[in-house]
């Protein structure tokens, strides 16, 4: 069908496999994104404050994602965390200041914001998007 691929794993060969399979089936492959950064980024002017709000939601999200994993499969969503501190240490879920987000963007080629992850308060999600648009994106556009 030539639909886009947003892979759930960071294995670099997935893009090649996808394109070859599209060709084999007679379809021109769509664009592909192979993620390279955390699976969730929230931008905050006070990460500790927002971790207190996001932590329980993110931990529940990680538990659901873990329950869907099957033996032998790899996924960026795979987490062994059972506490918020463990989740923070893993780095798959991150709450960053605008400057920390800019720095992260210089190291990875994909950024997954996912503002309403697992039922995050829409007002909190909107604040993150406003910080991204107002403080992160302008710095990325000038670099």
Segments predicted by a language model, with ranges:
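Glycine-rich, proline-tolerant flexible connector loops at the mouths of alpha/beta enzymes
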Residues: 9, 113-125
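C-terminal helical cap(s) of enzyme catalytic domains, especially alpha/beta-barrels
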Residues: 15-21, 121-141
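An alpha-helical appendage that flanks or caps ligand/catalytic pockets
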Residues: 11-110, 141-143
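Glycine-enriched alpha-helix->loop->beta-strand junction motifs that scaffold or abut catalytic
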Residues: 1-6, 107
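Residue-level preference for alpha-helix termini and adjacent loops
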Residues: 58, 92, 116-119, 130
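A structural signal for isolated positions on well-ordered beta-strands in alpha/beta enzyme cores
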Residues: 4-6, 36, 112
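Residue-level detector of alpha-helix boundaries and kinks
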Residues: 3, 35, 86-89, 117, ...
């Amino acid at each position: 069908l030539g639909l886009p691929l947003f892979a759930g794993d960071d294995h670099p060969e997935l893009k090649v496999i996808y394109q070859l399979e599209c060709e084999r089936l007679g379809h021109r492959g769509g664009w592909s994104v192979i993620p390279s950064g955390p699976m969730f980024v929230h931008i905050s002017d006070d990460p500790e404050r927002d971790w207190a709000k996001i932590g329980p939601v993110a931990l529940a999200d990680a538990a659901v994602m873990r329950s869907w994993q099957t033996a032998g499969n790899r996924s960026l969503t795979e987490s062994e965390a059972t506490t918020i501190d463990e989740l923070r240490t893993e780095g798959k879920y991150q709450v960053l200041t605008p400057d920390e987000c800019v720095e992260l963007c210089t190291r990875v080629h994909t950024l997954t914001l996912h503002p309403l992850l697992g039922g995050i308060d829409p007002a909190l999600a909107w604040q993150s998007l406003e910080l991204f648009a107002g403080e992160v994106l302008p710095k990325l556009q000038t670099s």
